[in-house]
Amino acid sequence: MKRPKLKKASKRMTCHKRYKIQKKVREHHRKLRKEAKKRGHKKPRKDPGVPNSAPFKEALLREAELRKQRLEELKQQQKLDRQKELEKKRKLETNPDIKPSNVEPMEKEFGLCKTENKAKSGKQNSKKLYCQELKKVIEASDVVLEVLDARDPLGCRCPQVEEAIVQSGQKKLVLILNKSDLVPKENLESWLNYLKKELPTVVFRASTKPKDKGKITKRVKAKKNAAPFRSEVCFGKEGLWKLLGGFQETCSKAIRVGVIGFPNVGKSSIINSLKQEQMCNVGVSMGLTRSMQVVPLDKQITIIDSPSFIVSPLNSSSALALRSPASIEVVKPMEAASAILSQADARQVVLKYTVPGYRNSLEFFTVLAQRRGMHQKGGIPNVEGAAKLLWSEWTGASLAYYCHPPTSWTPPPYFNESIVVDMKSGFNLEELEKNNAQSIRAIKGPHLANSILFQSSGLTNGIIEEKDIHEELPKRKERKQEEREDDKDSDQETVDEEVDENSSGMFAAEETGEALSEETTAGEQSTRSFILDKIIEEDDAYDFSTDYV
């Protein structure tokens, strides 16, 4: 019975009832034990595997491994398909009218047909598709936002793309300094002063955990003095809104804003922060956005997400390791991580990772693997795993490092004074400067002593023309599959040869066996007639044909 003014009923009961419950429980357990005893203990049969004496053991094991791998890939693909279907259903349930009214006309206008994309993706090179999508975004946009990582702004700029935007006509280019909470404030201010001489620059810090539009969240009472989570806070959103809104008023028409940049600089996170909803897919892995995506911010401003730039293979090894999503697959992890480590300040790296001084990258990765408990069989340090760990930290959004801006500003060859003035026209730069100052004051960046100094390799060259892209090599999985198939074919040929040899050997053995049997029988008869010590089983009957002397 629930007592008045209390949330829960009392758990007290009479002793008779408690003992009765305990007795029932004991009887139930006794009954279960008795049934288990009757059934007996059946030891599970151990899989004996393929015996060593079995023919074609290696081929059988290889087939079993391939079958297991195919099943795992099929399960993973089914899981991804289910997730996509659930996301589609959730979007339709939450906003059933947004797709036909807003998104479909825009997709038709910008040429975003999913069936065409699927048909092209099966035939054409994926990098060529990225170039096509990037060109579509630049052509369809009135304002282009180039997102830069505040830790290395110069390394996140692509001169080829900027030159294409300048040559395309009346388009505005704005720089966004994202991840500004991962650099010291002094360094952020110096980079802002350097970049704003050339183009309008916005200090930004995207929210990595926006509200999911299809997820129903429970309201939880928050403490009065409790600060919001670091990942939920967004800085610079108001300044960017005012900048785009002011430009739209000067144009007196609806504008389209394209968001471009290298992989993992936070393009989709900026769109989600502006929309305050999970509109674009974001994640730790690089290069998740593979096609342009139209997101209406309001009636007058439409924002377009784009795939990342394609990094030219002629760049330095550190630029390839930090900017290319395929660097860890194409290049060996040790080479990519060593290139990053060579550009970082050794003393600050030692303090950050709490390792002793190192002479080379191999020694550093060995000590790091021991410190992090990354071991292989036999207690050997997993050096490759430590290299992958360092690469993931430096390309992620958690490690604090910074670069110094150049001492003197020199405009690139595709920029001149008239182009700089034209790019800044139509924007309220005074209000932008005030908003940037407020954002810098609000952002809690790391101290200089807690961040790592990095030597930037300068501008990163990209590829925007399809003719400059060479044909892609098959992916690692496809290459492995082809190698396995080739091995399987060669093994089958060798097996057939072995079978032929064995069969011919068997036939030869049969023929020789008959001859040998005749020879041996003759030999046996001769030995029987000449060996006197051997006991010979003969008939006791008297043989009249034999002359006994």
From Swiss-Prot:
List every stretch annotated Intermediate.
Answer: 282-456
Q: Where is this region: Acidic?
A: 465-543
The superkingdom of the source organism is Eukaryota
Location(s) in or outside the cell = Nucleus; Nucleus, Nucleolus
UniProtKB keywords: Acetylation, Coiled coil, GTP-binding, Isopeptide bond, Nucleotide-binding, Nucleus, Phosphoprotein, Ubl conjugation
Show the ranges annotated as biased composition (Basic residues).
Answer: 1-45
Q: Which residues carry this modification: N6-acetyllysine?
A: K79
Annotated region Disordered: the residues are 1-56, 73-104, 474-532
As for what it does, the entry says:
May be required to maintain the proliferative capacity of stem cells. Stabilizes MDM2 by preventing its ubiquitination, and hence proteasomal degradation.
The molecular function terms in GO held by this entry are: GTP binding; mRNA 5'-UTR binding; RNA binding
Region of interest (Basic), ranges: 2-46
> Hey, what tissues is this thing expressed in?
Increased levels in lung tissue in cancer patients.
Q: What is this protein called?
A: Guanine nucleotide-binding protein-like 3
InterPro entries given for it?
G_CP_dom, Gnl3_N_dom, GTP-bd, P-loop_NTPase, TRAFAC_YlqF/YawG_RiboMat
One biological process GO term for this chain? positive regulation of miRNA transcription
Q: Where is the composition biased (Basic and acidic residues)?
A: 73-96, 474-483
Q: Does the keyword section mention Cell inner membrane?
A: no
What is the phylogenetic placement of the source species in the record?
Eukaryota, Metazoa, Chordata, Craniata, Vertebrata
Which Pfam family name is an example for this entry? MMR_HSR1
Q: Where does GTP bind?
A: 178-181, 261-268, 305-308
- Assembly and binders: Interacts with MDM2; this interaction stabilizes MDM2. Interaction with MDM2 occurs in the nucleoplasm and is triggered by a nucleolar release mechanism, such as mitosis-induced nucleolar disassembly. Indirectly interacts with TP53, via MDM2-binding. Interacts with TSC22D1 isoform 2.
One GO cellular component from the entry?
midbody
Where are the residues linked by the Glycyl lysine isopeptide (Lys-Gly) (interchain with G-Cter in SUMO2) cross-link?
K91, K99, K114, K179, K196, K253, K267, K275
Q: Where is the composition biased (Acidic residues)?
A: 484-501
